[in-house]
């Protein structure tokens, strides 16, 4: 099982709307994430816009590819792009960070 953590930056003027959108994630998007192997997935957002994501999956590259192949993910990413500081698709611009310690 891969444990994946990633960082991104949400625009400060869009924090409230970004939070609101994630209180009501589309059912089709949730189903696609599960079907693609995304488990124990969490997103954390600091007041300065720092976003930290965490998920567990058997194969991260395969899980990314499976999501990239879905229409619902393409629509979701297109809508979410405007919330992020960096341009481009949010799911392609995340900075994955290395795990250096784990305690079970």
Where is each model-derived feature located?
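Basic/polar N-terminal segments that are highly enriched at the extreme N-terminus
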Residues: 1-3, 102-104
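Short amphipathic alpha-helical segments
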Residues: 14-39
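Short acidic, gly/pro-rich beta-turn/loop elements at beta-sheet edges
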Residues: 16-18, 53, 63-65
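Short, glycine- and small/hydrophobic-rich beta-strand elements in well-ordered beta-sheets
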Residues: 30-52, 56-58
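An amphipathic, aromatic/His-enriched active-site/gating alpha helix that lines ligand/cofactor pockets
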Residues: 36, 57-94
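Eukaryote-biased recognition of C-terminal alpha-helical segments
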Residues: 95-102
